[in-house]
Swiss-Prot record:
SUPFAM superfamilies linked to this entry: Domain of the SRP/SRP receptor G-proteins (SSF47364), P-loop containing nucleoside triphosphate hydrolases (SSF52540), Signal peptide-binding domain (SSF47446)
Sites where the protein binds GTP: 104-111, 184-188, 242-245
Taxonomic lineage of the native organism: Archaea, Methanobacteriati, Methanobacteriota, Stenosarchaea group, Methanomicrobia
EC number(s) stated in the UniProt entry for this protein: 3.6.5.4
One Pfam family in the UniProt entry: SRP_SPB
Name of the protein this chain belongs to: Signal recognition particle 54 kDa protein
Swiss-Prot/TrEMBL catalytic activity: GTP + H2O = GDP + phosphate + H(+)
GO-annotated cellular components: signal recognition particle
Organism: Methanosarcina acetivorans (strain ATCC 35395 / DSM 2834 / JCM 12185 / C2A)
Length: 440
């Protein structure tokens, strides 16, 4: 999950608010203290935290809740709005031909982000390529070349040429028929005069439409100083924050964004190309506060899945064979890690907390199910009712799994089939379930 530790702490503070008997000044102060502690532990700038805390207190005690909203919901709404104020709106990313220059500290994930960014645009239907203009770090050329080939995006580089400005010039000419041209520059300390000068010369040659600064989520308070230096040099138009998955604090990077007023363009939440997301502030805050991000989940599903993957019409009519389940498991794999998918669900719709061990065990079990189904016949996959004792033994032997594992799979399939029939019959009221869980 994105900034898991901060999310857990903020959700804990909101649960205290939801569970309070009445919303008075004492309750608000306690909740604000918990929020303060969570943000400071995540390395968010003290000045930003204190300013936000004061505004939450004042608004919670003075503002009247809007019509149809109770005091608890009103305070949660205020917290949401004030967090939005710190982070700001995401950068506007237009799907049109453009040149992008990548800058940032060495080790921030800049080269990997350059390739993932190209892949992002390619998934949107634009022809994208990268220019390897990092001549400072050994291995940078080969890293970007390998990533570009793996992701099937265009690449230009000149191995052995130390002149980054010349490479940029030649690369942009070589990729002139591409819609998106991304220049990967050398990672540097923002106060190194010679490297800053090179960056400015590349900027003059490339004339980029966007200058994206890449920040490691764990950089801490020094992020602000670095961000200001880069901004003063080339004028940052957007920020990419990497390594926001897991326990990364991320507050320093978010503070830097707030201070420089450069909007966040993308966030990296994992190692695969699919773990690179266009930043949407409202969705980001919703996930932090445990409200889920169903819009991103639907977009991820649309990008990853084809009509062949899931036969929605058949499912809603209650027809759910083992073949359908097999396709469903493959489709889930395309969407990314289970933990990331679950983080997009609100608390009460499956977005409850699981340990890493539980996520791993579930993922392993899903893989095991696929192995078992690979040992079944076409008839068995279409109509599991024909699978009796002798067939279970054969499937068990063929898959290398136990008979108990095969029976467990059949039981899981039956449960899924029953659940789908329930949804078809309208037995589940999701909104009612959420209200009950959240105590609203």
């Amino acid at each position: 999950m994105v900034m898991e530790k901060l999310g857990d702490s903020l959700q804990g503070a909101l649960k205290k608010l939801i569970g309070a008997g009445r919303i008075d000044e004492r309750t608000v102060n306690e909740v604000v203290k918990d929020i303060q502690r969570a943000l400071l532990q995540a390395d968010v700038n003290v000045k930003l935290v204190m300013g936000m805390s004061q505004r939450i207190k004042e608004r919670a005690m003075k503002e009247e809740p809007p019509a149809g909203m109770n005091p608890r919901e009103h305070v949660i709404r205020i917290v949401y709005q004030e967090l939005m104020e710190i982070i700001g709106k995401g950068a506007e990313i237009q799907l049109k031909p453009q040149t992008i220059m990548m800058v940032g500290l060495q080790g921030s994930g800049k080269t990997t982000s350059a390739a993932k960014l190209a892949r992002y645009f390619q998934r949107k239907g634009l022809k994208a390529g990268v220019v390897a203009a990092d001549t400072f770090r050994p291995g940078a050329y080969h890293q970007l070349k390998t990533l570009a080939e793996k992701l099937n995006v265009g690449f230009y580089g000149e191995e052995g040429n130390p002149d980054a400005v010349e490479i940029t010039k030649n690369g942009l000419k070589a990729l002139e028929k591409y819609d998106i041209r991304i220049v990967d520059t050398a990672g540097r300390h923002a106060l190194e005069a010679d490297l800053i000068e090179e960056m400015e010369r590349i900027h003059a040659v490339a004339k980029p439409d966007h200058k994206f600064m890449v920040l490691d989520a764990g950089i801490g308070q020094q992020a602000s100083q670095q961000a200001h230096a880069f901004n003063d040099s080339v004028g940052i138009t957007g920020v990419i924050i990497t390594k926001l998955d897991g326990t990364a604090k991320g507050g320093g990077a978010l503070s830097a964004v707030s201070e420089t007023k450069a909007p966040i363009a993308f966030i990296g939440v994992g190692e695969t190309p699919e773990d690179f997301e266009k930043f949407e502030a409202d969705r980001f805050i919703s996930r932090l506060l445990g409200m889920g991000d169903l819009k991103s989940l639907m977009e991820k599903a649309e990008e990853s899945l084809s009509e062949e993957d899931v036969n929605v019409e058949a499912l809603m009519q209650g027809r759910f064979t083992l073949k359908d389940m097999y396709k469903q498991l493959e489709a889930m794999n395309k969407m990314g890690p289970l933990k990331q998918i679950m983080s997009m669900l609100p608390m009460g719709m499956g977005g409850m907390k699981f340990s890493d061990e539980m996520f791993q065990a579930t993922s392993d079990k899903m893989k095991n199910y696929k192995v078992i189904m690979d040992s079944m016949t076409e008839e068995e996959m279409t109509d599991p009712r024909v699978i009796g004792g002798s067939r279970i033994k054969r499937i068990s032997k063929g898959s290398g799994c136990s008979s108990e594992d095969v029976r467990e799979l059949l039981k899981y399939h039956k449960t899924m089939q029953t659940a789908l029939k329930g949804f078809r019959g309208g037995k589940f009221n999701i909104q009612k379930m959420m209200k009950k869980k959240m105590g609203m």
